[in-house]
Structure formats: C-alpha cells, structure tokens
A protein has these predicted regions:
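Proteins with a high burden of low-complexity, intrinsically disordered sequence enriched in S/T/G/P/A and R
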Residues: 28-31, 37, 156-165
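An N-terminally biased module of ancient metal coordination in phosphate/nucleic-acid-related enzymes
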Residues: 1-72
Length: 165
C-alpha cells in the first residue's frame, strides 16, 4: 500500500500562493493518485492520502472581524471534511492546528476532529501561521499534549528556506 502523507485538495484558490487556474479539487487529486506510477516496473497507484486544507486558506487573518476562532477553524477544515466523508477509502483526515484561532479553540477542535470525524494526524504550519514553536510554548504545548493523549502523530513545518538565505 502506498500512502501520501501531504496532499492539499481545495475547492478554492490557495490564498497564500495565489495559484492561477482551477482549484486542485478532490477529483483532480483522485485522478493524480490513480496514476499509474511504475514501481519496479509494475503499474501502481497511490492508495490513500492524508489530506488537509492548503495552508494559505488556514490563515486566521482572512476572517478577522467576521468569525470567531471555532467558526474559522470549521470553515477552513470544511472541504477536507467533505472529502474524507465522500471518499473514506482513499482519504485520511489531517487536522491543521492554527493557534491564532485561539489555543483553546484549536485544542478542542483537535479532539473533535479526531473523535467525531476520525482524523488521524495533526499538522502545525508555524511558518504560515507566523510563530516559532520553540518560542510559542504556550501555544503549542497544549496541542502536543492533546495529540499525545489521543495518540495521533503531529507533523510540524517550521520554515521554508529560499536560496541565498
């Protein structure tokens, strides 16, 4: 079985990367996953994928003044949840934790998405959400503790390096 651990289907353009053209929907992702890809000369497909929203669409500032933290979380996770529900045989939910939506809101959402929706992993995108995990322990420690309690792994991205830096 081949499992991709980082896919970002969406029904809207990623707000951070300003991609042009059509959004990378669940149908496009499934088509990509179906391949075929040749491994040791044999045609294969990607059997399952951990999916989460594109990180640019999880930035809290785009809802400032319109929604509270929990509403913002549920909005940015909505398409991922829809995909997981529609194709549970192919997609595994990965919750994106953004402490800028409120630590309490985020920790409660981790538990809700794992227990109620069957999500199996949590991702922290410190670079997109503008914090350093080593300096924001009050933000990340409660989330790590909740993930440990629930037995779900955490993927943490701390920086994107560019050439010359």
């Amino acid at each position: 079985m081949i499992i991709d651990i980082s896919c970002y289907p969406t029904d809207q353009v990623d707000l951070a990367w300003c991609h042009e053209g059509e959004p990378y929907t669940m149908d496009r992702l499934l088509e990509t996953m179906d391949g075929p890809y040749f491994v040791n000369g044999k045609p294969r497909r990607i059997d399952k994928a951990f999916i989460q929203p594109p990180q640019g669409n999880t930035i809290y500032t785009w809802t400032d003044g319109d929604k509270d933290g929990r509403q913002s979380i549920d909005d940015y996770m909505a398409y991922t949840l829809k995909c997981v529900r529609k194709h549970p045989d192919r997609f595994i939910g990965c919750f994106v934790y953004n402490p800028r939506c409120g630590v309490k809101n985020g920790v409660e959402a981790i538990e809700r998405y794992v227990k109620e929706h069957g999500f199996k992993m949590v991702q922290m995108q410190a670079n997109m959400h503008a914090y350093r995990p080593d300096r924001a322990l009050d933000w990340v420690r409660p989330a790590f503790e909740k993930c440990a309690e629930l037995g779900v792994p955490v993927v943490t991205t701390v920086a994107v390096r560019k050439r010359g830096l």
